[in-house]
Amino acid sequence: MRVCYFVLVPSVALAVIATESSETSGTIVHVFPLRDVADHRNDALINRALRAQTALDDDEERWPFGPSAVEALIETIDRHGRVSLNDEAKMKKVVRTWKKLIERDDLIGEIGKHYFEAPGPLHDTYDEALATRLVTTYSDRGVARAILHTRPSDPLSKKAGQAHRLEEAVASLWKGRGYTSDNVVSSIATGHDVDFFAPTAFTFLVKCVESEDDANNAIFEYFGSNPSRYFSAVLHAMEKPDADSRVLESSKKWMFQCYAQKQFPTPVFERTLAAYQSEDYAIRGARNHYEKLSLSQIEELVEEYSRIYSV
């Protein structure tokens, strides 16, 4: 993020413009004659000077094409790996790096080849080598955050294909390391209020575990085995424009089946759902905020459950 400060100094007929990067805490000060600022014909000149800020901020760099693009991105990843970054900085930098990786064809393959051939641990594929390097540099949570925040809007685009390729590589890496579903959900959560049932998050979670049922169970356990939290998250996701109705209905039915298999009669299910709305359960499990179920939502859920339980 760039912040600009503009100060007029009439006594010496000068204008001072300071641009500051929130990423690096670096600042560039520009001094212009006041007449140049007042004359809009000089806008291009002033804008060119202000673009010197790009040297301070990675996401403003003009990335080259061809071999130079590969070299530039490798240099960026290696530089990020050499410096000590706090969690917030890692989140920002990995998102920018991820966007560049999926921006052009075969960047993933070329950069993966570099890390595959580099001294160090052996890898089976180029993609595995790149995924390992990204996780080492930005952490599991950083990589998970990049996946959740960089999915291209057009699922048929080349970028979407590249994003899918990277996600598969990370999921395969985590499986190979023996990560449990709890590990994966905790990485995706990253301490924030995450919509686990959003298409990007849920699809990636399923890639990392064995099935949709395993993904649902991992989310349920993350919510402290609280059905109120679980149903609230599902219903909230259903309101989104990009909601996947099939997946969400299946996730809702999974929760119903859990109680039906325990032989919970409908009245007991209703009382259980209401009980988990109490403050005693609000602080258990995951700390992220959620909206409690409304009375009408509880009534609808109970009605749906009664149809399943009676079958």
Curated annotation (Swiss-Prot):
Belongs to the RxLR effector family. Residues 127-209 are annotated as: WY domain 1. Keywords: Host cytoplasm, Repeat, Secreted, Signal, Virulence. A motif (RxLR-dEER) lies at residues 48-62. Secreted effector that acts as an elicitor of hypersensitive response (HR) specifically on plants carrying both defense protein RPP1 from several ecotypes including RPP1-NdA, RPP1-WsB, RPP1-EstA and RPP1-ZdrA. Monomer. Interacts with defense protein RPP1 from several ecotypes including RPP1-NdA, RPP1-WsB, RPP1-EstA and RPP1-ZdrA, via their leucine-rich repeats (LLRs). It comes from the Eukaryota. The ATR1 effector protein of Hyaloperonospora arabidopsidis is a polymorphic member of the RXLR class of secreted effectors. The ATR1 alleles are differentially recognized by RPP1 genes from different Arabidopsis ecotypes (Niederzenz, Wassilewskija, Estland and Zdarec). GO terms for cellular component: extracellular region; host cell cytoplasm; host cell nucleus. InterPro entries: ATR1_N (IPR053992), ATR1_WY-dom (IPR048935). This is Avirulence protein ATR1. Residues 1-15 form the signal peptide. Residues 210-311 are annotated as: WY domain 2. GO terms for biological process: effector-mediated perturbation of host process by symbiont. It is found in: Secreted; Host cytoplasm. The keyword Phosphoprotein does not apply. Pfam families: ATR1_N (PF22223), ATR1_WY-dom (PF21421).
